[in-house]
A protein has these predicted regions:
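Active-site metal-binding loops of divalent metal-dependent hydrolases
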Residues: 8-9, 120, 215, 268-269, ...
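Conserved N-terminal subdomain of the carbohydrate kinase-like
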Residues: 2-3, 11-114, 130
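Conserved phosphate-binding/catalytic region of the ribokinase-like
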Residues: 110-111, 126-143, 147-155, 168-260
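Nucleotidyltransferase catalytic core that binds NTPs
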Residues: 231, 255-386
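Short, glycine-rich nucleotide/cofactor-binding loops
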Residues: 6, 32-40, 123-124, 265-276
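Extreme N-terminal starter segment of soluble prokaryotic enzymes
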Residues: 1-3, 261-262
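Short internal beta-strands
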Residues: 61-63, 142-146, 161, 182, ...
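Short, conserved phosphate/pyrophosphate- and ester-handling motifs at nucleotide-, phospho-/glycolipid
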Residues: 162, 213-214, 273
Length: 386
């Protein structure tokens, strides 16, 4: 699938330095001694940069740099001192809109599955309604990151306002279109094709919120191009935005930031010992999420005999959940975890010891990685000493 990005291109300029004294010229303001500076893409360009870096076939409508806003942030010793915005006022807004629309009229929208309108109200999307009509006529779905009232985006397939922007909308007007409402401190609320989704946002240490919305949008559209269902697209978007805010300055997502690589392993884990812990830690290093299939008490008895397990399934599950590198522990009652493996659909299944990959249950579902067990550590040996 191919994506087109149209919108306000912003250049985010960061000036870094240190402060040791106040400005001797007065005003009780800090004197910043510059050490270095960098310029990053922002606005519509950041959406395009993220999508491209995630491997999406993506184009952007460029326009004269003279009409693009530059946001300069002065940062001293890790703290923002001020932000200076530069542009050319109403003239630039007018000229940007005219140039973008003239270019858009020559675009064959049938080449694109999705068109993203990234609106920062800087003029590039002056003709947003006309652009949406052109895209719709070619069967291209329009997704809008808005900066204004609904009337500017009539006909869009989906609108992604933040909470403040959503309050400006009359929901009687947008009742028949898809929406995603984001807010840093609240769950993401989405309504797509008549289904409502509510996704929690896990707390993270926030370094900078600049560009988080652009990363969210890019990650969501990335999911669409991969053919994922809407819930998974939203989960990816939340994950992408959460990753972005943990970095200073605008951040460009890497594939590993949005795609989870699920690792699965299974066992009884009756008496948790060092061998287990090192094996599980090695398993987690192969991906981003470690899921353990834990044999139920009845399953353990069938495998190990009536004297086992020593610890019941709830205690064994809780012990595994306490390990920082374990993400999920699922109890299964069958003799093998095959049905659970098919349900989870992991990328990798790990097994310890001298197994051959072709003998491991689930080898038809995922790749198999055999990890060495730590010598002289086993539950059987521990039990024999009791």
């Amino acid at each position: 699938m191919r994506v087109l990005v149209i919108g306000d291109i912003i250049r985010d300029r960061y000036v870094y330095g240190s402060t040791e004294r106040l400005n001797p010229e007065g005003g009780a303001v800090p004197l910043v001694r510059q050490t270095y500076e960098e310029t990053k893409l922002g606005g519509a360009a950041l959406v395009w940069d993220n999508l491209t870096n995630l491997g999406v076939d993506c184009d952007i409508v460029e326009y004269d740099k003279r009409f693009q806003d530059v946001k300069t942030r002065i940062i001293s010793d890790g703290h923002y001192i001020c932000r200076v915005d530069s542009g050319f006022g109403d003239v630039a807004v007018y000229l940007a809109g005219e140039e973008v629309y003239n270019k858009v009229k020559a675009i064959d929208f049938s080449r694109y599955s999705y068109c993203i309108l990234s609106d920062y109200d800087k003029g590039a999307l002056t003709y947003s309604k006309e652009i949406i009509k052109l895209a719709n006529a070619a069967g291209c779905k329009v997704i809008v990151d808005p900066k204004g009232t609904y009337e500017r985006y009539v006909g869009a397939w989906l609108i992604k306002p933040n909470k403040l922007e959503a309050n400006k909308f009359n929901y009687n007007d947008i009742d028949n279109i898809n929406t995603i409402t984001t807010n840093a401190e609240s769950p993401v609320v989405a309504r797509i094709d008549g289904v409502t989704y509510l996704l929690p946002v896990d707390p993270v240490e926030v370094a900078d919120v600049t560009g988080a919305g652009d990363c969210f949008l890019a990650a969501f559209v990335y999911g669409l191009t991969k053919g994922y269902d809407y819930r998974k697209c939203l989960e990816i978007a939340v994950r992408g935005a959460s990753t972005a805010v943990q970095h200073r300055g605008t951040y460009v997502l890497e594939p590993e930031d949005v795609e989870q690589k699920i690792i699965f392993t299974n066992g009884c884990f009756d008496i948790l010992h060092r061998g287990h812990i090192e094996y599980l830690e090695s398993s987690k290093k192969l991906g981003t999420k470690l899921v353990i299939g834990l044999n139920s008490d009845d399953s353990v008895k069938r495998l190990k005999g009536e004297s086992r397990p020593i610890n019941n399934q709830e205690d064994r599950q809780r012990a595994l959940q306490s390990l920082r590198f374990v993400d999920e522990v699922v109890i299964f009652d069958e003799d093998t975890p095959y049905n659970l493996i098919k349900q989870i659909n992991p990328d990798i299944i790990t097994k310890g010891g001298d197994y051959k990959p072709e003998d491991v249950i689930g080898n038809d579902v995922a790749d198999i990685v055999i990890l060495p067990y730590k010598e002289n550590y086993s539950t059987t040996n521990i039990v024999s000493k009791l």
